[in-house]
A protein has these predicted regions:
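Residue-level recognition of single "structural anchor" positions
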Residues: 1-236
Length: 236
């Protein structure tokens, strides 16, 4: 798909805007890193312009990818990690399926039963109850899963949840690249799209698991989804 050149009320063409948003959410780049990469191509803009594009268009890209990505498996891994935002601790709840597809991330202040209920409610609004949910030994999961997913088998064992724990690694790398996270709303927006981009460009492409021809086909399919979302920016 070829992108139309112009985006209403914007000075730069759609192809540049969509690439800048993709670079920020696909790789461990800061806004200034992307500014420099584009400058190497002769595209002169400020890092604030890149930031504004990401803030404005992230939710649109996330929603389009969510509609087009493949359905998750019937086995989910739920896990939490602590992130600091301006020095204040927050709990990031994350759910992935057995193949590494990220279902959702949700930033909260607590790691208690109420927080688990809110997270499960978000998941179940988007996906049917799975066959199995794997968690660590956090007791906050026990009753919410029992009553909200009555037919789901709950496996609570730290050693079984490596898939969930490994899913946090891209977040840690991005956090290190940015030095620190600065706002809860910004982190939620950033990580929500990062997960969806990773689903189609990393998990589905399978950089280390598939032969080159299959990777190229999978990348082309992921790119088609991204360009479709980019073309829809004119309707916002």
């Amino acid at each position: 798909m070829q992108l139309s050149q112009n985006l209403k009320r914007h000075r730069f063409p759609l192809s540049i805007i969509s690439q800048a948003v993709w670079l920020y959410h696909r790789f461990n780049h800061s806004y200034r890193d992307i500014q420099e990469q584009l400058a190497f191509r002769g595209i002169i803009l400020s890092h604030e312009t890149v930031r504004e594009w990401c803030l404005k268009f992230a939710n649109h890209f996330k929603n389009v990818i969510k509609k087009r990505e493949r359905k998750p498996s019937d086995k989910w891994h739920l896990d939490e990690m602590t992130v600091k935002i301006n020095g204040e601790p927050f709990i990031l709840w994350r759910a992935v399926d057995s193949e590494g597809i990220e279902l959702d991330v949700f930033l909260q202040k607590r790691r208690n039963k109420k927080a688990a209920i809110r997270f499960l409610s978000r998941l179940l609004r988007s996906y049917p109850s799975p066959r199995v949910i794997v968690t660590d030994k956090l007791k906050s999961y026990n009753k919410p899963i029992k009553y909200m997913c009555a037919k789901t088998k709950h496996r609570s064992h730290k050693g079984l949840n490596n898939r969930g724990e490994n899913a946090h690694q891209p977040t840690r790398r991005k956090e290190k690249c940015l030095i620190k996270f600065k706002s809860a709303q910004g982190v939620q927006r950033l990580l929500s799209l990062m997960g969806k981009v990773r689903n189609i460009f990393a998990v589905d492409v399978g950089r280390y698991k598939k032969k080159a021809s299959d990777r190229r086909l999978a990348f082309a399919a992921a790119q088609a989804i991204w360009l479709e979302a980019a073309q829809g920016l004119n309707s916002i």
